[in-house]
Amino acid sequence: MDSPLRIALIGVGNMGQQHHLHLKTLSEGRLCAVADPASQAAGIAEQWGVPHYPDHRRMLEQVRPDAAIVANPNNLHVATALDCLAAGVPVLLEKPVGVHLDEVRELAAAVKSSGIPVLVGHHRRHNPLIVRARELIQGGALGRLTTVTALWQLHKPDSYFEIPWRREPGAGMLLTNLIHDLDLLRHLCGEVQQVQAITSNAVRGFANEDCAAVLLQFANGALGSLTGSDAVAAPWSWELASGENPVYPQQADQPCYLLAGTGGALSIPQLKRWRYAEGSEGWHQPLLAVEESCAAAEALCLQLRHFVKVARREVEPLVGVADAARTLALLEAIREAAATGRGCAPATIEG
């Protein structure tokens, strides 16, 4: 039996602490060190019983971990991951993979040249609900996918914005939240060829959006829409519908994604599938509905188990750097479309 993987944690903010929570339950890996320059980081490391380093580069040199989780601020993701690769350390890199495509391309090139794996933390792909939904879609249960409706509608309280950077450009719901939904839409429905978008900050007046409407044209011919707002009293979002994170009260009967094709339709996260009976079709005929079964499991924990296998070179990353870069390219196309009022195509990502 393999000994537990020695995993270092770079960044002990909210996501870093969530990773530690799940790492404690993992027999395949254990926390070996913490790196974070914040004043409270040393105390957190002491509570966790591991050494603390203000500088992650010194930690990599002295501790020589088997793998590292990078969960520091977004603008440091690429530089920190590059330092890990230079030290020969596999990385679980929190989303977003980076802030700008140019730096992410640099990271993708470093992964290719070094052969050191990087798993990007779009953890919802690991959720059994999404695994089953993708199986149904790719297995032809919906026929030819035709339309996709995605909703992200909830209310962030005023206290959320007491942290100043959350009111600044680039820190709005597109990069912070909707990037998850865009990644799942790519994962479930395929690549997006073109987008149109409108964003608004009319509710709060901050320097970032509180409402967005996006039209998506998929490469397979399907058309989709994503409507989002973090300033509304509504139950339609992955956070509220899926029950994935217990800090949010679950609205289990409400969907956040509605996918329809020539042979059926699917609501997510309920996994409720609609179709006509054999030999009947058309709007005068009743639709049959069945809820697909799916074993519940914690996506972040499943992601960590997958990361251990990635670090040991047993499997390829479910979400590699180039894959995550395509989600970032889609997000950048949406921003450009909203700014210019024109349809925009996501940048091409090699690999």
What residue spans do the PLM features occupy?
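Beta-loop-alpha module in the N-terminal Rossmann-like domain of NAD(P)-dependent dehydrogenases
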Residues: 19, 37, 48-110
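Short, Asp-centered acidic motifs that coordinate Mg2+ and/or phosphate
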Residues: 33, 67, 147
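Hydrophobic residues in well-ordered beta-strands that form the structural core
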Residues: 54, 93, 118-120, 149, ...
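Predominantly a Rossmann-like dinucleotide-binding segment in NAD(P)-dependent oxidoreductases
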Residues: 117, 124-216, 223, 341
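NAD(P)-dinucleotide binding in Rossmann-like oxidoreductases
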Residues: 205-209, 219-302
